[in-house]
Amino acid sequence: MLNLLYNQIFNVILNDVPTPYNTYFQDSATPNQEGILELHDNIMFYLLVILGLVSWLLFTITRTYSKNPIAYKYIKHGQTIEIIWTIFPAVILLIIAFPSFILLYLCDEVISPAMTIKAIGLQWYWKYEYSDFINDSGETVEFESYVIPEDLLEDGQLRLLDTDTSVVVPVDTHIRFVVTAADVIHDFAIPSLGIKVDAAPGRLNQVSALIQREGVFYGQCSELCGTAHSAMPIKIEAVSLPAFLEWLNEQ
């Protein structure tokens, strides 16, 4: 009991999976997702300020009008207030827009990737290729990843999220994901990593990730792609570099 209490107080339990009634983001594991969280929190501050100001104005005007309906009957222009309600929203939009564009372009940058993983969406599973590595047969390391049926789930496994094979990657390594599809449009999305990129047939899209901690991160296809769209989970295991090399030798 004391050990459980100690762990709850002093150990940080990170949320890397969807949880019931959760109204916020999953915990970030990459700089991109940290930037998204910071941008969201900053924008929410300005939205709350605007909400408070508009609510106060609405309440004040309604109360004043109810007391004296003809108080401003002969006022046709209010140059000062017109200048304020034109400039103030423009300034707010600029304050929001600049960080948004900076983050948008930073997320699109692929900085000297140490390894490339190709993710191919198919109805209704994912196929992965480690293009930089060749096995003993002289072929690139590749495998398919299917959702584990509900009746085969073991204790601790997640419904519609766990897969029979995982994408294993090393931490603190610049990784490039090249995403495409072989049939219809899919979407490769992992919330904790700040990744969401379309997988379109005949088109290669790329996104980078620098995973900063070990863990298991889940995602799903985020583009309606057919009857089994919900059965296209993504499971990424971030491990230490020695553990990754050991896994690679087994392939």
UniProtKB/Swiss-Prot annotation:
Residues 63-82 are mitochondrial matrix. Cu cation A2 binds at residues 221, 223, 225, 229. It is an enzyme of class 7 (translocase). Keywords: Copper, Electron transport, Magnesium, Membrane, Metal-binding, Mitochondrion, Mitochondrion inner membrane, Respiratory chain, Signal, Translocase, Transmembrane, Transmembrane helix, Transport. Cu cation A1 binds at residues 186, 221, 225, 232. It comes from Lachancea thermotolerans (strain ATCC 56472 / CBS 6340 / NRRL Y-8284). This is Cytochrome c oxidase subunit 2. Mg(2+) binds at residue 223. PROSITE patterns: COX2, COX2_CUA, COX2_TM.
